[in-house]
C-alpha cells in the first residue's frame, strides 16, 4: 500500500531502478518474496503508466513479461494470469495478503469502467478494504490520471483536518499527518523524480 508514492517518484526513471527501490522498500517490513516481487511489479506499473500513457492492456502485458523476467513465485504468477478473468476468490479469510490486493488491482485495471467504480467495487467486496482500495486506486489513478478521481473525494481529502477536541473527530491526528496537501505532495514527487 505504501509503495505507490515510489512508483510516482520513479515515473522518469528506468524500470530496473524502480524495481530495485521497490524491493528494498518492501524488504524493510515485508520480506516475504511474494510481497517483494509484487511491490516491484506494482511500482514499475505505476511508473510506466504515468510516463508512457500505455493502455491498461499493454501495461498488463508488460507486467506478465516483468513477472517472468523476475521469476516471481508461482502464487504471484497465478494471480497475475488469473486477473483478467477473475477476482480473488476470498477477500475475507485471507485479508491483508498481497496476492488478494494485487490480483484485485489488476482485475480492476482491466475491467473497471472508471477509477471511481473500481475503488467502490473493491471496497464492496470486503476484507482488508482500505488496503485493497488504496492499491487498486493507485493503479487506476496512474492509468487514468488525477482528473479521474471524483471531485467530492478530492474535496473531502483536501478539507480533512482531524483536530483533537472537535465534536465530529473520533480519531484525531497531528497536523503534519493531515492530507490537506496531498495534491502538492504528488506534484512534488513527480518533480523530484524528473
Regions found by a protein language model. Name each.
Residues 32, 36, 67-81, 150, ...:
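Short, structured coil/loop segments at alpha-helix boundaries
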Residues 47-126, 143, 187-193:
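Accessory "access/gating" subregions that flank catalytic or transport cores
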Residues 18-21, 59-64, 153-156:
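Extended, well-ordered alpha-helical scaffold segments
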Residues 1, 16-39, 53, 130:
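Phosphate/ribose-phosphate-bearing ligand recognition and processing surfaces
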Amino acid at each position: 500500500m505504501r509503495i505507490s508514492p515510489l512508483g510516482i517518484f520513479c515515473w522518469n526513471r528506468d524500470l530496473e531502478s524502480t524495481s530495485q527501490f521497490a524491493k528494498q522498500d518492501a524488504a524493510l517490513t515485508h520480506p516475504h518474496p511474494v510481497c517483494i516481487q509484487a511491490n516491484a511489479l506494482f511500482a514499475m506499473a505505476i511508473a510506466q503508466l504515468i510516463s508512457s500513457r500505455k493502455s491498461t492492456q499493454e501495461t498488463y502485458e508488460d507486467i506478465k513479461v516483468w513477472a517472468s523476467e523476475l521469476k516471481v513465485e508461482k502464487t504471484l504468477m497465478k494471480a497475475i494470469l488469473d486477473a483478467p478473468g477473475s477476482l480473488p476468490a476470498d477477500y475475507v479469510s485471507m485479508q491483508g495478503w498481497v496476492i488478494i490486493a494485487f490480483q484485485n488491482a489488476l482485475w480492476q485495471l482491466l475491467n473497471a469502467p472508471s477509477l471511481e467504480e473500481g475503488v467502490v467495487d473493491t471496497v464492496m467486496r470486503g476484507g482488508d478494504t482500505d488496503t485493497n482500495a488504496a492499491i487498486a486506486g493507485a493503479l487506476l489513478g496512474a492509468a487514468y490520471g488525477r482528473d479521474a478521481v471524483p471531485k467530492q473525494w478530492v474535496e473531502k481529502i483536501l478539507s480533512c483536518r482531524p483536530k483533537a477536541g472537535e465534536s465530529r473527530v473520533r480519531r484525531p491526528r497531528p497536523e503534519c499527518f493531515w492530507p490537506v496537501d496531498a495534491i502538492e505532495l504528488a506534484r512534488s514527487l513527480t518533480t523530484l523524480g524528473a
